[in-house]
Every structure is written in structure tokens, then in C-alpha cells.
């Protein structure tokens, strides 16, 4: 199923059974690729259903999904047409382990630091309002990802 998804539009009308199957396939793909190439496993496995829900409700890339740190964006990459190249994750000239607008228009920022998503999303939202762009902006934050709060 994942090989047939070229954009988030392709998942909008899936049944619950198909969503469950897609979730399992995304998890298996992430586990297989991270097992070979390294990467952020737990943070990505933990947001599979959230990522599917975001892409079903919102219209990416017109609606901007901004990932805090962005190390949990692997399902997002798979749902935005990068499945065919996903095996190159974190390899030279391959898919980045973080969001990267040079890879896809659904990635708005290169990220890698915590707590930048809110300010990035706010800046993007203000810019859109000034341009009368009605696209939505969503910041996805993941707290307590293996770190103790300060």
C-alpha cells in the first residue's frame, strides 16, 4: 500500500482497516530502514497514527506541518512521496533524517533543535496572513522525548 502513496491526498479516503494496515506498513518500513542506516526509531514509531491523522485532516503541503526538532518526521516523509527513496535515509546524497525543504515542498524548514517549531510556525502564519494566504500552520511538539525537563 505504501508504494502507491505519492502524496497525502492518497490517504484521505482510506477505510479504518486500510489505515491500520498502512500504520503497520509504515512502522515496518521505519524499523527496517533505521535498522540498516541508523536513525531515530522510537520517536518515529510513536507518531505514526498522529502523522496519518494530520495528513488526512489538513492539506499538506498547502497547510504547513512544522515538526519540532523534526527527528520524528519519517512517517511524514513516507506519506509525502518519498517511499521509493526512503532506503537512502541518512546516507550520502540520500533522504535527510530531518525535514528539509530541498527534498520536498511539504518540509518547510531544516530543523534539528528543540522548541523552534512554535516560533517558526508563528512566523510562517504571520507571513501567510500578510499575503492573504489561507493555508493553515500546524506545529507538532513532542515533549519529554527521553529527556528530563529542566
Locations of regions flagged by a protein language model:
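Cofactor-/ligand-binding subdomain signature composed of acidic, glycine-rich
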Residues: 1-33
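Asp/Glu-centered strand-loop micro-motifs enriched in Gly/Pro and often flanked by an aromatic residue
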Residues: 32-41
Amino acid at each position: 500500500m505504501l508504494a502507491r502513496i505519492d502524496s497525502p491526498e492518497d490517504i484521505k479516503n482510506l477505510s479504518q482497516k486500510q489505515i491500520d494496515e498502512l500504520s503497520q506498513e509504515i512502522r515496518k518500513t521505519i524499523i527496517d530502514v533505521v535498522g540498516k542506516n541508523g536513525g531515530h526509531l522510537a520517536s518515529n514509531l510513536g507518531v505514526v497514527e498522529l502523522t496519518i491523522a494530520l495528513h488526512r485532516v489538513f492539506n499538506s503541503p498547502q497547510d504547513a506541518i512544522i515538526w519540532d526538532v523534526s527527528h520524528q518526521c519519517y512517517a511524514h516523509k513516507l506519506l509525502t512521496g518519498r517511499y521509493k527513496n526512503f532506503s537512502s535515509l541518512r546516507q550520502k546524497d540520500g533522504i535527510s533524517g530531518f525535514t528539509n525543504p530541498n527534498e520536498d515542498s511539504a518540509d518547510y524548514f531544516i530543523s534539528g533543535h528543540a522548541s523552534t517549531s512554535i516560533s517558526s510556525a508563528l512566523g510562517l502564519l504571520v507571513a501567510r496572513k500578510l499575503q492573504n494566504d489561507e493555508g493553515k500552520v500546524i506545529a507538532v511538539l513532542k515533549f519529554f522525548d527521553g529527556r528530563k525537563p529542566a
